[in-house]
C-alpha cells in the first residue's frame, strides 16, 4: 500500500519578516535554508538533516535590528508546517528522545507530539551570554515558538559543555533525531487512550 507523503508549505508576511517554507517529512535530508542569520541557518540545517526531512526555507527579516523576529517567526512557521504535515497525527510513534555529544558538550532532547504545547528549557547556564552575536535567550524563544506552533511538549536540557556553538549543535542534532523517532509511522491508530491528540 502506497502512503501519501506528509508535506506542508507555509508562508508568512508581516512588517518584521517574510517567510516561505516547504517541509517534507519523508525526505532525504535535502535542506536549503536562508534566513540572514548564519547560526540559525546552521542549526536548522542540522535539525532537518538529522530528522530526515527535506526543508526549503527562506526568510527576509529585520536583521538590522537583531535576529529575534527572524528566529521566532521561522520557528512558528516550522512548527506550523510540522503540525499541518502530521494532520491528525494518526499512526505516529509520537515520542522521541536523543542525547548527542559534540566534543565537550552534551545535550538531551525529549519530545511528545501530544497536542499539548510546552517547553522545558534546562541547563542554559552552560550557554555563554552571547552566541554568534545574539543573546542566548534567542534560542529559548526559538524553541518555545516551535513547540507552541507544533503543539508539542519539548524538553531541552544542556547537560554540560563550555562552547556555545557546540552546545547548540548538540541540541539541534538531538532535536532532529527525536523528531525522526516521533514522526515514524508504526500503527494505524492514534497513540492515545483518549483517542485523539489535541
From Swiss-Prot:
GO terms for cellular component: cytoplasm. Its EC number is 4.2.1.19. Its main location: cytoplasm. CDD domains: IGPD. The keyword RNA-binding does not apply. GO terms for molecular function: imidazoleglycerol-phosphate dehydratase activity. It is found in: Cytoplasm. Transmembrane segments: none annotated. It catalyses: D-erythro-1-(imidazol-4-yl)glycerol 3-phosphate = 3-(imidazol-4-yl)-2-oxopropyl phosphate + H2O. GO terms for biological process: L-histidine biosynthetic process. PROSITE patterns: IGP_DEHYDRATASE_1, IGP_DEHYDRATASE_2. Pfam families: IGPD. Keywords: Amino-acid biosynthesis, Cytoplasm, Histidine biosynthesis, Lyase. Pathway: Amino-acid biosynthesis; L-histidine biosynthesis; L-histidine from 5-phospho-alpha-D-ribose 1-diphosphate: step 6/9. HAMAP family: HisB. Belongs to the imidazoleglycerol-phosphate dehydratase family. This is Imidazoleglycerol-phosphate dehydratase. It comes from Nitratidesulfovibrio vulgaris (strain ATCC 29579 / DSM 644 / CCUG 34227 / NCIMB 8303 / VKM B-1760 / Hildenborough). The lineage of its organism: Bacteria, Pseudomonadati, Thermodesulfobacteriota, Desulfovibrionia, Desulfovibrionales. The gene is hisB.
